[in-house]
Amino acid sequence: MQISTRRFLILATTALLLPVFSASVSAQRNPAMTEQQRDAEKEAYYAKFLDHKRLPTGEQQRLAYEDAKRYLERFGGDNDANARAVRKFVTEYEKFTHEYDINTAYGAKNYAKTFEIGRPILQKDPENFYVLGVLTEAGYENALTGNVSLNAETIQFARKAIQLVDDGKVTTADPFKSIDVARGFLNFALGSLLKEQSPVEAAAAFLKAVQSDSPFRTDPIAYHRLGVAILKGEFAQLSAEYNEKFGNKPSSAEQKAMFDRITHLGERAIDAYVRAVALSTSPQQQETKNKILAQLTALYSTFHNNSDAGLNELIATVLSKPLP
């Protein structure tokens, strides 16, 4: 039987296309198989993760974390309940280990190591209040040893932590006992680190520290530093400006207004010194108290016609009065 040329071409073409169609059908079936395999693999990964997570030992939690990381490498783009649970575990585990590591370094007084651990955490999470707080503590204590290498960073961390507190973004006070204690310490530390280079900002920080419901409200050192910062900062600046603008010139309304501002700053400084003396009640504080009292007497006399009359009464009653 003869097959026409046209029919032969049709049959031949059909024969050539059959493998293609067959492959196409096969390709359409494979995703279903792949999806099943993926689901099975995903369940296996999750089951392994749960097996380790159920056991509360440190080693099992570490293994669960490794399982979770592998799970997210394969299925991190998914958003089902299991994937969300794994992501939550990773976040909480990393938070715990970071806090443990940074606390260990800080507890050992290895302040440089504390910063090494904290820096990359803040790069990923700039508003991590816990880390900002620990680094401020570490940086402040490092400065007390005479090492100023961490001061610049500590100042920035303290400013950021204070901003978070002032903006109401801090819901958990850790590493501090309370938000007020955090506000007190952070401002005291900031003021202490700035008191030489920027006394105006330092005075503002010390004022916030003593106004907080924290131990710094009754800390004589905080009040003494507040008084010194007022004198070295705004009082000195305004006095220099006053002498330049109004020295040996007739009085004027502008001159009087500036003079009144300077006088008020002096009164604020005296008040801070007086509170420092009044709050120095323990035997261990007596040597420091006597030094501050000598400074206070000279300062008070300058503003009271070279007389210290009324100073003792002021010391006795100052704690019953509000800050000026």
What is each PLM-predicted segment?
Residues 51, 71, 101, 135, ...:
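Structural register within alpha-helical repeat arrays
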Residues 30-35, 72-92, 119-131, 145, ...:
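Flexible helix-coil transition and linker loops at the boundaries of alpha-helical arrays
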Residues 65, 115, 155, 203-204, ...:
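Tetratricopeptide repeat
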Residues 51-62, 84-87, 96, 100, ...:
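Short coil/linker segments at helix-helix boundaries
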Residues 38-46, 59-64, 90-101, 113, ...:
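Generic helix N-cap/helix-start motif at coil->alpha-helix transitions
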Residues 172, 247-249, 256, 260, ...:
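Terminal, low-structured helical/coil segments at or just beyond the last alpha-helical repeat
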Residues 21-108:
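N-terminal leader/linker segments that initiate helical-solenoid repeat arrays
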Residues 10-20:
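Bacterial N-terminal signal peptides
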